[in-house]
Curated annotation (Swiss-Prot):
Organism: Synechococcus sp. (strain CC9311)
GO process terms (BP): tRNA methylation; tRNA wobble uridine modification
Principal cellular location given in the protein's record: cytoplasm
PANTHER family: GLUCOSE INHIBITED DIVISION PROTEIN A (PTHR11806), METHYLENETETRAHYDROFOLATE--TRNA-(URACIL-5-)-METHYLTRANSFERASE TRMFO (PTHR11806:SF2)
Protein name: Methylenetetrahydrofolate--tRNA-(uracil-5-)-methyltransferase TrmFO
Enzyme Commission number(s) from the entry: 2.1.1.74
Any single Pfam family the record assigns to this protein: GIDA
Binding locations of FAD: G11, A12, G13, L14, A15, G16
Disulphide connectivity of cysteines: none
Record InterPro entries: FAD/NAD-bd_sf, MnmG-rel, MnmG_N, TrmFO
Keyword Heme: no
């Protein structure tokens, strides 16, 4: 081991939780700092680790999808956070979604019970000493004091965009005489509740969205607010055009209520098909709570209740959580980070999670895995590792460290980040399958060569 025989991890979100676990699993003592519950961000509701503040979904499960491939790579690397998500999953069609409460509680208990993990429930006001091996995993809602110190260290103003979370309603309050259970194109079980609209209902709903009063966002210019395109507020989609929502979260294609008649009868299909459909996804194991898919919003809470109750089936909906919007901060990673997630100016300091400019839950976990693994390797006196560019994790970390600087924006996992295949495959699913096969083969080779400890450990 090096003279520095312990690691500090700041932030117990998805990335910090994974990082701390990987450090401890490598036999290295780790101190995990988390400011909650004594100081909360605008988006958090609990003091549990790895709280999911937006959706409860990690994205598609299928490994020929970008998010699904990222999840599968993490499973094979022994990710605690992903394996725990598998254990606490709820029905969500072809996606990996979890019971938020049980999921976060399980991860909190796993770290609390680990003999090498020390938890400090207080705010970290400054970056650790330069000689301290540390992982910065404070997320997009980094506290003001630490953000100020980070700006002083990097010599740069942080970048930011605005993100939002969807409302959640009680399942018993949904009128199932108007709504119906189904998954799109009948894939898998009928895991979603669907609220169909005709054209008049949709236009009235859109008009109400456009007229609704928004909550005031602090510390930013309303006219220059930047949103992440993958998580736009529903009212922003409404502003972009009459059909924008219908080609986004409210698209009706592939959803049919058997009460309408025979879907294979063309005349029935033309007469009965919905103009738009609002989908709700299960939040908990018992199916008592449901979130409105794609309904991130910054409307005032009273306005949310008024407008969302215009949706057929939700006229008497009981809201257990309203949508909120918050500022997301991220680093100018191409200027600051190596593909190992070390800061170029301070190799003992690593960054992980959404603060690095990756987008999505699974990407945050991936950053936590790599930063935690490399922090432990530094303690043991080993060189930090990179994952192959042909893996989804490697493609993401290479992108954020090598992208053109100046206009850097958060990036979700996608196959466009990966090196092209040697052979030309025109059919998309087959092409994505080939990307997957190459990625998993190269990942296994790296696991074998680097002696990665990928023992399955679930909370």
């Amino acid at each position: 081991m090096s003279e520095q025989s312990s690691v500090v991890v700041i932030g117990a979100g998805l990335a910090g939780t994974e990082a701390a676990w990987q450090v401890a699993k490598a036999g290295v003592p780790v101190t995990l700092w988390e400011m909650r519950p004594f100081k909360r961000s605008p988006a958090h509701h609990s003091s549990e680790f790895a709280e999911l503040v937006c959706s409860n979904s990690f994205g598609a499960l299928s490994s020929d999808r970008a998010a699904g491939l990222l999840q599968e790579e993490l499973r094979r690397l022994g990710s605690l956070v992903i394996q725990t998500a598998d254990h606490h999953s709820v029905p969500a069609g072809g996606a990996l979604a979890v019971d938020r409460g049980r999921y976060s509680a399980a991860l909190t208990s796993a770290l609390d019970d680990h003999p090498l993990v020390t938890i400090r429930r207080e705010e970290q006001l400054t970056l650790p000493d330069p000689d301290q091996i540390a992982v910065l995993a404070t997320g997009p809602l980094t506290s003001e004091a630490l953000a100020d110190d980070l700006r002083a260290f990097t010599g740069r103003e942080d970048c930011h965009f605005f993100d939002a979370a969807s409302p959640i309603v009680e399942g018993e309050s949904i009128d199932m005489t108007k709504a119906f259970r189904a998954s799109r194109y009948d894939k898998g079980d009928a895991d979603y509740i669907n609220c169909p609209m005709d054209q008049d209902q949709f236009l009235a709903f859109r008009a109400a969205l456009l007229d609704a009063e928004q909550a005031e966002l602090k510390d930013f210019d309303q006219n220059s607010a930047t949103f992440f395109e993958g998580c736009l507020p529903i009212e922003e989609l409404a502003r972009r055009g009459e059909d924008t929502m219908r080609y986004g979260p409210l698209k009706p294609i592939g959803l049919w209520d058997p009460r309408w008649g025979d879907v294979n009868d063309r005349d029935v299909r033309r007469a009965k098909r919905a103009y738009a459909v609002v989908q709700l996804r299960q939040e908990d194991k018992d199916g008592r709570l449901w979130n409105l898919v794609g309904f991130q919003t910054n409307l005032k809470w009273g306005e949310q209740k008024r407008v969302l109750r215009l949706i057929p089936g939700l006229e008497q909906a009981d809201f257990v959580r309203f949508g909120v919007m918050h500022r997301n901060t991220f680093l100018e990673a191409p200027e600051l980070l190596e593909p190992t997630l070390q800061f170029r100016r301070r190799p003992h300091l690593l960054a992980a999670g959404q603060i690095t400019g990756t987008e999505g839950y699974a990407a945050a976990v991936a950053g936590g895995w790599l930063a935690g693994t490399n922090a432990a390797r530094l303690v043991h006196g080993h060189d930090p590792m990179q994952l192959p560019h042909t893996t989804m994790i490697g493609a993401l970390t290479h992108f954020i460290s090598e992208a053109p600087s100046g206009k850097f924006q958060p990036m979700p996992p996608n196959f466009g980040l990966m090196p092209q295949l040697q052979e030309c495959i025109r059919e998309k699913r087959a092409r994505y399958g080939a990307y997957r096969d190459r990625a998993l083969a190269d990942l296994q080779r790296t696991i074998d060569e680097s002696q990665v400890d990928n023992v399955v450990c679930t909370a």
